[in-house]
Amino acid sequence: PLKETKKKEEAVEEKEEPVVEGRKSKRKKKKKEEPKEETPEPVEPEDPRAKSKGTELVLYNLKTGESKSITGVMEYSLTEKGNHLFFEYDKVDSLNESGIHAINTANGEMTTLNEGMIEYKKMSTDEEGNQIAFFATANTKDDDHKYFSLMHWSAGKASATIVADTTTAGVPENWMVSDNSNIRFSESGKRVYFGTAPRPFEYAYEADTTLLKDDRPDVDVWSYNDPYIQPMQKLQAGREKNRSFDVMLDTQTGKLVQLAGPDLESVTIDTRNDRDFVLAMNDQPYRTQMTWDTQIPRDFYKISTSTGDAELLIKGAKGFPSLSPAGNYLTWHNIEDGHWYMMNVASGNIKNLTEGMSVSFANELHDSPSLAGSYGTPGWSDDDAAFFLYDRYDIWRVDPKGGSAVNVTNGFGRQNKITMRYQRLDREARTISTEGRATLSAFNEWTKASGFVTANMNGSSDPQIVVMEDMSIGGLIKAKNADRVLVRKSTYQEYSEVYAANSVSMTGLKKLSNVGAQEEPYNWGTAELIEFDNTYDGETMQAILYKPENFDPNKKYPMIAYF
């Protein structure tokens, strides 16, 4: 009986189950497989680049057609003038060590600036391309904290040297170089700006491994006297953790000067000038007011670039003062009274520039529950000789040494409801030339026509219209070394195409692009400027009526009103 039972069980195992449609059979008849001889899979040779976390960088000579390939590159920087290529190697093999290297593009010579550090960050070069600064650290990810150094190299030196770390004179006690900051050279190359920050601080309980999670403090304490409310503190916690404070390095003497700190967090650095001071702003005494007023006052200081000492210039300013190009004056728009003010930095004297003038320099159409901002300023003329201001329509010239303000556009804008704004054709220019005629954009507030006019910035006369059409004309760009310009023209029905002209006189205007052709197969629409009287006060208003291209005036259409 035992043998018969065993035979029946074997028969059941070998019997296949019926196949149900849509369901796979769970059991299949086993087939005896012949043993196969295993063949080893081919082993591909190891690519040495696989060891690197970097990528391949190709330096191509456009004149000769020659190229140089560099593998394992983590970061690179080609100088503005193209005379040096700086890059960071990640270790690929025994021949290529990790580090910062430089290639002289004129002769192809490569120089190793530094190697052996664990991490390099944020390479920055000067304008001439003969200097580089970067952050480096020997700390690994296993260390509790990373302490970075600032390293600097200039052409002619054998290697880069550490110019700032925790031990350098000028770095505050218990502070360190912050890799969260950016590195910037001044235009002259004589200064490097970067950031420092307090070293990480740990409470005793944080390092105590015997404490359970429930035994560790985890509370948020807030007081009504705190500068920011608790939700804002939480929102800014990450930024505050990574905050750094500006410091200046003199590349010739190696001297460090701390410019910013916890009491003066915001410093305005103009890398185009090597002045003996920088402008700093402090809003800490007024931050509690942000709970009910976003337009809070601010105190402004000048910080000596020799000593780091701060001198108060303006207390409780309701505006944002900015320095003139030569650094002689501070100008700002006071949002409380709507006037422009000027301070002589040397004497500290302040005067109202727009008091008694017949027009407003604050936004006349401002309609929100806040103080109106200004129409802005196009800037200064050479040597801080004149300061220019915008009103709603025209441009004004103000003499910082005294005298009456002059309406450069002679009131033409207000008389014709045309808003005019200065066009900076030389993108590298820092001041406004008062010689010859300047190009201004023009926009008719009522007809919506736009174009360009020219004006004498040193006098007072009606502008001369260059081009004015019932379409949007803008985006004026002038060639650097030729009297050629590009503009863009468009309407609701015509795409913003690019046009070229022989000069700012817009002669020989030629269409260069034809992107609008892609719209031809589609039913587009029309736009019509209409006028109506406001039933509330009788004022004449304007609106745009959009209709489909195949609009039938005999049909009724649904209408959406947006106001």
Model-derived segments and spans:
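Serine-hydrolase catalytic core recognition
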Residues: S460, G474-F563
